[in-house]
Regions:
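Short, Lys/Arg-enriched, Trp-marked, Pro/Gly-tolerant hinge/linker segments that flank
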Residues: 1-11, 50, 54-58
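Basic, amphipathic alpha-helical hairpins
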Residues: 14-28, 48, 52, 69-80, ...
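Alpha-helical residues within the helix-turn-helix
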Residues: 35, 46, 50, 87-88, ...
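Central "turn" residue of the DNA-binding helix-turn-helix
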Residues: 38, 90-91
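Key DNA-contact positions within bacterial/archaeal DNA-binding proteins
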Residues: 42, 94-95, 110
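Terminal helix-turn-helix DNA-binding modules in bacterial transcription factors
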Residues: 51-88, 115-128
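A secondary-structure capping/hinge motif
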Residues: 51-54, 100-112
């Protein structure tokens, strides 16, 4: 993939990372992302800084946090530990995951689960 112009480039970058789930690789770096999608590191950095107002790690970890949230919402994952879901989502450190989750979501993963479970219960009781 090559970005021909600057218009729409942020959306294209987001789409590539999202659809290919490149963020699941805990070893993902700017260099490996660049090689995977065929855009120079310099151009990716420009897009992230100027268009999305994020640095590389914030950008990638945002996808990882959303992945964890989706996994937490899946009843089929209820038996799994939160940290297992975090590792499956590309995190490689419990401390980093907890810090970033709280920073992005505004509460700890455990508090989020309680809130999510409560919302699910309220919704299911509404439809009974």
């Amino acid at each position: 993939m090559r970005l021909m112009n600057r218009r729409g480039h942020a959306e294209e970058l987001v789409q590539q990372v999202k659809t290919r789930k490149l963020y699941l690789d805990p070893e993902l770096t700017l260099s490996t992302l660049s090689k995977a999608i065929g855009i120079s590191e310099r151009e990716i950095t420009f897009i992230l800084n100027r268009e999305l107002h994020q640095n590389f790690y914030y950008f990638i970890n945002s996808f990882r946090i959303e992945e964890v949230k989706a996994k937490l919402a899946d009843p089929g994952n209820k038996h799994l530990k939160i940290i297992s879901l975090a590792y499956e989502s590309g995190f490689n450190s419990k401390a980093t995951f907890n810090r970033l989750f709280k920073s992005h979501v505004g509460m700890s993963p455990s508090a989020y689960i309680k809130t999510s479970e409560y919302q699910r219960l309220v919704m299911s009781e509404t439809f009974i």
